[in-house]
């Protein structure tokens, strides 16, 4: 294969959505698989919008996903600049070339003229399209319109007979009847380029070898092929990847939950999991394997294994996959990923010291196998950082109201208090509790369940002895004292009140 040069060219008008992220990923994987170049280009010709913040957001999302680029608007390259707003002179130059070659003409039709043409076509039962009336304008007619203050747009003369064939890597050959193609505008009346024109000029000038983009751009392709040929650029290979649909096969939207990369990030998904999931939206690895490292994706990725059928977005599958990564990634990586969540909750300082990070690592070790996201990990860890929690109501009724529960908790507390520091481990505390259970002649749950509730406020979570080991001796004793006092003040008083009524 010749040198691979691919690009991701977002319009910076908002967050990077998963459709765009998947397109960027497929381009990036293809480039890395073939040792080619991946280019980040901004399609920011709409100068009426404030795009700097949106561009920064897109860049941040790509970097968070681990997608890097070889050339781009923020790092330059041999074919820059890489912002369309900085390439207007090139577009004007190429437009002048089309005009000089007789392939384009000035169109003086006003928006009102065009609206009237569309309405006339609808009344005739025809598909509305520009009727080409300005193709044959005389010089005198043009001067008259310009004297009237009408600023023209530049249109390209599209072929009116024959067929334009799109050779798509995924969909095969698709023919478009040239009679259906409008004489498209390439330069607007305000002097700016249109999307189709700027896209072709940029792809041609930047020597893009493969245009890998979303299926919805397929209808633009025959027009762009005509422009490629008129301008004399080498035609890239076109690859239109399938749409991503909601589970009900409707268009994916906000009502289906998070759809933007920064939303998934805020919800506690790992970039490793999201990249893995996006790769499988439309691409088949040809095996039952579901979890891939980035290196495995780069080695395995092939456009020939991309389906032409719509991919179905399934947040349950993504959530499951995220849980797999939470369990399989190195401990240090999960600690790094959850840090901002813990800092936002106030559990970790802005510049944590080694002791804080060591404690966080032990919390993560205890909790991560029971959660699906970093946000869940943060929430499930709350009682490791706060002792002012409320006790679960059902847990109170089930475990704190049993006769003799305060005595049982006190015996467990005494056993923990006698353990030396070197024995205050998972194994050491479990052995101490087993001895108490044997001495009392009760079931294990009789001591373990109320102790869990006393230490965490919850009835489910990590193993009790993992909780004890993480909290440490001093904190465990304080929480057991608090629970014993709370039962005496609340449960026992409530029982006495019930008895008197």
From Swiss-Prot:
<feature type="short sequence motif" description="'HIGH' region">
    <location>
        <begin position="10"/>
        <end position="20"/>
    </location>
</feature>
<dbReference type="InterPro" id="IPR001412">
    <property type="entry name" value="aa-tRNA-synth_I_CS"/>
</dbReference>
<feature type="binding site">
    <location>
        <position position="254"/>
    </location>
    <ligand>
        <name>ATP</name>
    </ligand>
</feature>
<dbReference type="GO" id="GO:0000049">
    <property type="term" value="F:tRNA binding"/>
</dbReference>
<comment type="subunit">
    <text>Monomer.</text>
</comment>
<dbReference type="GO" id="GO:0004818">
    <property type="term" value="F:glutamate-tRNA ligase activity"/>
</dbReference>
<dbReference type="InterPro" id="IPR045462">
    <property type="entry name" value="aa-tRNA-synth_I_cd-bd"/>
</dbReference>
<dbReference type="InterPro" id="IPR020752">
    <property type="entry name" value="Glu-tRNA-synth_I_codon-bd_sub1"/>
</dbReference>
<dbReference type="InterPro" id="IPR004527">
    <property type="entry name" value="Glu-tRNA-ligase_bac/mito"/>
</dbReference>
<dbReference type="InterPro" id="IPR014729">
    <property type="entry name" value="Rossmann-like_a/b/a_fold"/>
</dbReference>
<dbReference type="InterPro" id="IPR049940">
    <property type="entry name" value="GluQ/Sye"/>
</dbReference>
<keyword id="KW-0436">Ligase</keyword>
<feature type="short sequence motif" description="'KMSKS' region">
    <location>
        <begin position="251"/>
        <end position="255"/>
    </location>
</feature>
<dbReference type="InterPro" id="IPR033910">
    <property type="entry name" value="GluRS_core"/>
</dbReference>
<comment type="function">
    <text>Catalyzes the attachment of glutamate to tRNA(Glu) in a two-step reaction: glutamate is first activated by ATP to form Glu-AMP and then transferred to the acceptor end of tRNA(Glu).</text>
</comment>
<keyword id="KW-0648">Protein biosynthesis</keyword>
<keyword id="KW-0547">Nucleotide-binding</keyword>
<dbReference type="GO" id="GO:0005829">
    <property type="term" value="C:cytosol"/>
</dbReference>
<comment type="similarity">
    <text>Belongs to the class-I aminoacyl-tRNA synthetase family. Glutamate--tRNA ligase type 1 subfamily.</text>
</comment>
<dbReference type="Pfam" id="PF00749">
    <property type="entry name" value="tRNA-synt_1c"/>
</dbReference>
<dbReference type="InterPro" id="IPR000924">
    <property type="entry name" value="Glu/Gln-tRNA-synth"/>
</dbReference>
<protein>
    <recommendedName>
        <fullName>Glutamate--tRNA ligase</fullName>
        <ecNumber>6.1.1.17</ecNumber>
    </recommendedName>
</protein>
<dbReference type="InterPro" id="IPR020751">
    <property type="entry name" value="aa-tRNA-synth_I_codon-bd_sub2"/>
</dbReference>
<dbReference type="InterPro" id="IPR020058">
    <property type="entry name" value="Glu/Gln-tRNA-synth_Ib_cat-dom"/>
</dbReference>
<keyword id="KW-0963">Cytoplasm</keyword>
<dbReference type="GO" id="GO:0005524">
    <property type="term" value="F:ATP binding"/>
</dbReference>
<dbReference type="Pfam" id="PF19269">
    <property type="entry name" value="Anticodon_2"/>
</dbReference>
<dbReference type="InterPro" id="IPR008925">
    <property type="entry name" value="aa_tRNA-synth_I_cd-bd_sf"/>
</dbReference>
<keyword id="KW-0030">Aminoacyl-tRNA synthetase</keyword>
<keyword id="KW-0067">ATP-binding</keyword>
<dbReference type="GO" id="GO:0006424">
    <property type="term" value="P:glutamyl-tRNA aminoacylation"/>
</dbReference>
<dbReference type="GO" id="GO:0008270">
    <property type="term" value="F:zinc ion binding"/>
</dbReference>
């Amino acid at each position: 294969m010749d040198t691979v040069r691919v690009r991701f060219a977002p319009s910076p008008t908002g967050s990077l959505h998963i459709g765009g992220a998947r397109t960027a990923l497929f381009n990036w994987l293809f480039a890395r698989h073939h040792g080619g170049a991946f280019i980040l280009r901004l399609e920011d010709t709409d100068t009426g919008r404030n795009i700097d913040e949106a561009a920064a957001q897109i860049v941040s999302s790509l970097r968070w996903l681990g997608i890097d680029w070889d050339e781009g608007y923020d790092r330059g390259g041999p074919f820059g600049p890489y912002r369309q707003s900085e390439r207007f002179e090139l577009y004007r130059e190429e437009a002048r070339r089309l005009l000089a070659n007789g392939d384009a003409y000035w169109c003086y039709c006003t928006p009102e003229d065009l609206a009237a043409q569309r309405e006339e076509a609808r009344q005739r039962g025809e598909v509305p399209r520009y009727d080409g009336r300005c193709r044959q304008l005389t010089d005198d007619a043009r001067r008259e319109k310009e004297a009237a203050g009408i600023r023209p747009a530049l249109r390209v003369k599209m072929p009116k007979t024959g067929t334009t064939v799109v050779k798509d890597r995924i969909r095969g050959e698709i023919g478009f009847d040239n009679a259906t193609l409008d004489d498209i505008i390439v330069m607007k009346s305000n002097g700016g380029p249109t999307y189709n024109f700027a896209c072709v000029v940029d792809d041609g000038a930047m020597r893009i070898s493969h245009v890998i983009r979303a299926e919805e751009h397929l209808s633009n392709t025959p027009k762009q092929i005509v422009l490629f040929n008129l301008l004399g650029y080498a035609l890239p290979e076109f690859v239109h990847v399938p749409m991503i649909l909601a589970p009900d096969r409707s268009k994916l939207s906000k009502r289906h939950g998070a759809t933007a990369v920064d939303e998934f990030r805020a919800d506690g998904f790992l970039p490793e999991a999201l990249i893995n999931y996006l790769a499988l939206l439309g691409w088949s690895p040809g095996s039952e394997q579901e979890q891939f490292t980035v290196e495995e994706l780069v080695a395995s990725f092939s456009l020939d294994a991309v389906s032409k059928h719509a991919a179905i977005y399934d947040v349950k599958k993504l959530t499951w996959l995220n849980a797999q990564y939470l369990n399989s990634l190195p401990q240090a990586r999960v600690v790094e990923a959850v840090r901002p969540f813990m800092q936002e909750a106030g559990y970790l300082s802005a510049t944590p010291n080694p002791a804080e990070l060591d404690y966080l690592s032990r919390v993560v070790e205890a909790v991560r196998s029971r959660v699906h996201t970093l946000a869940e990990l943060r929430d499930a860890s709350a009682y490791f950082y706060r002792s002012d929690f409320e006790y679960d109501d059902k847990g109170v009724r089930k475990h704190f109201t049993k006769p003799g529960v305060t005595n049982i908790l006190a015996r467990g507390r005494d056993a923990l208090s006698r353990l030396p520091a070197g024995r205050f481990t998972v194994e050491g505390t479990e052995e101490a509790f087993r001895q108490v259970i044997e001495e009392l002649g009760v079931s294990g749950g009789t001591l373990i369940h109320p102790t869990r509730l006393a230490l965490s406020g919850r009835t489910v979570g990590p193993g009790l002895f993992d909780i004890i080991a993480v909290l440490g001796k001093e904190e465990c004793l304080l929480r057991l004292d608090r629970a014993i006092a709370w039962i005496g003040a609340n449960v026992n008083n409530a029982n006495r009140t019930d008895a008197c009524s």
